[in-house]
Swiss-Prot record:
This is Uracil phosphoribosyltransferase. Catalyzes the conversion of uracil and 5-phospho-alpha-D-ribose 1-diphosphate (PRPP) to UMP and diphosphate. The gene is upp. It comes from Corynebacterium urealyticum (strain ATCC 43042 / DSM 7109). Allosterically activated by GTP. The keyword Magnesium applies. Gene3D superfamilies: 3.40.50.2020. Binds 1 Mg(2+) ion per subunit. The magnesium is bound as Mg-PRPP.
Length: 215
């Protein structure tokens, strides 16, 4: 699996805004949108293109378009914030959804939604989630994609923790690439990324209201 840490001044600047505890929901959301577009740009640099003739106001030029646009799959809830940035870069992409919430007692992912095409074989998939912490949610989502035949998976995460990256690398799952803005060294006692940026879903949308024990 290829791991790409995007080291760019604008990436570092937006990431700093997201890390800052003083950033309110609006500021955090705007920074996430900018950073999301930058990471999708990096993640898409090896998508296959096809050429065609395009008429300019002067003559004919060679044009290019994606031969097989990817499907963008956010892990709900925080991943929802990455849909618009992804579509701004790849407007002809499809969108699927995987809903996973973290059980705060066990730190394990609890699935509650799946909306994916029946057959993803031969289809580039970009699995997007701002955080890769323990790796539990991401691996759960990758396994769902594989069950639907996915064989070309790129994970796009803004902040990754080394334990989660190691878990993904050692999973044996067919993830081709991880694109991230940073790899933080550790998790705290509550399995949050340290230093991280807190709960991305809460900082985007406010505290969640999902009763996991009733599911």
């Amino acid at each position: 699996m290829d791991i790409k840490v995007v080291n760019h001044p604008l990436v570092r600047a937006r990431l700093t805004i997201m890390r800052d505890a003083r950033s309110n929901n609006v500021v955090f959301r705007d920074a996430l949108a900018d950073l999301g577009a930058m990471l999708i740009y990096e993640a898409s640099n090896d998508l296959e293109t096809e050429s065609f003739d395009v008429e300019t106001p002067v003559s004919t030029a060679e044009g290019h378009r994606l031969k097989n646009p990817p499907i963008i799959v956010p892990i709900i809830r925080a991943g929802l914030g990455m849909i618009d940035p992804a579509l701004s870069m790849i407007p002809d992409a499809q969108v699927g959804f995987i809903g996973l919430a973290r059980d705060e007692k066990t730190h394990e992912p609890v699935p509650y939604l799946e909306a994916l095409p029946d057959d993803l074989s031969g289809q580039p998939v970009m699995l997007v989630d701002p955080m890769l912490a323990t790796g539990g949610s991401l691996l759960n989502a990758v396994e769902l994609l594989v069950e639907h035949g996915a064989d070309d998976i790129t994970c796009v995460c803004m902040v990754s923790a080394q334990p989660g990256v190691d878990k993904l690398v050692n999973s044996g799952l067919p993830v081709r690439k991880l694109v991230t803005a940073t790899i933080d060294p550790a998790l705290d006692e509550n399995a949050y990324i340290d230093p991280g940026l807190g709960d991305a879903g809460d900082r985007l949308y406010g505290p969640r209201n999902i009763d996991l024990e009733s599911r």
